[in-house]
């Protein structure tokens, strides 16, 4: 099996899906918990217009802060997201061919689709789904997106989310993310993942778990909530969705700090879901 560098894995996936016909988009410039939160998925999966895109999305999950000490769990990581709308009949075959392009021999390695229906409570999104395991390790999530913002997706979109770090761990045969070959160079030009990201991982973990100001975050949540509602009334669903993302991230930070109770957590989830719903509803009204 070819031992592609981390950036070669990304480039290979971009080239593969570009050749299929996907537009290669850029990461969204906001804090998101997963590639699904990019408006290219949340908003564009709604409505009837065909939409085929692929993109890398840096993602943040404050609750996964481990000061860079966990072998494969981090508060900041990368996903490669593919959206095919409508979902083609051969989407599973397309996915498997993408693995072959990464040097994974399907005749040798055990690839399994393990049923795992997907749901995002804050987005009001759900779909039939499968985890994809390679020799017992999850490397991707495969979902037929059926609902976003509480609105049915017609037609259903196919979503493929590659966990780039886990995929790279398997392809390169290493045990810790920090040891991943980032750029495929040797000597002075060689870079490991840890050299690129792990100082930030430690610093943001300390911030997320110890130093974030909960009172400030509560104010930010309420401010973003109010601003989202105001922008929807002004028929501006895209900047409104940005405010929804800000509220969602503030909630995730509060959750990581452990300052909200179980009951409060459920209330915050419903508030973020409401924001996502009104953004999706307004966007669909304006883009039928």
UniProtKB/Swiss-Prot annotation:
It holds the Pfam family tRNA-synt_2e. InterPro entries: aa-tRNA-synth_II/BPL/LPL, Gly-tRNA-synth_heterodimer, Gly-tRNA_ligase_asu. It comes from the Bacteria. One of its GO terms (molecular function) is glycine-tRNA ligase activity. Its EC number is 6.1.1.14. Coiled coil: none annotated. The keyword Ligase applies. It is found in: Cytoplasm. It catalyses: tRNA(Gly) + glycine + ATP = glycyl-tRNA(Gly) + AMP + diphosphate. GO terms for biological process: glycyl-tRNA aminoacylation. Keywords: Aminoacyl-tRNA synthetase, ATP-binding, Cytoplasm, Ligase, Nucleotide-binding, Protein biosynthesis. Gene3D superfamilies: Bira Bifunctional Protein, Domain 2, Class II aaRS and biotin synthetases, domain 2. GO terms for cellular component: cytosol. Tetramer of two alpha and two beta subunits. Belongs to the class-II aminoacyl-tRNA synthetase family. This is Glycine--tRNA ligase alpha subunit. It comes from Rickettsia rickettsii (strain Sheila Smith). The lineage of its organism: Bacteria, Pseudomonadati, Pseudomonadota, Alphaproteobacteria, Rickettsiales.
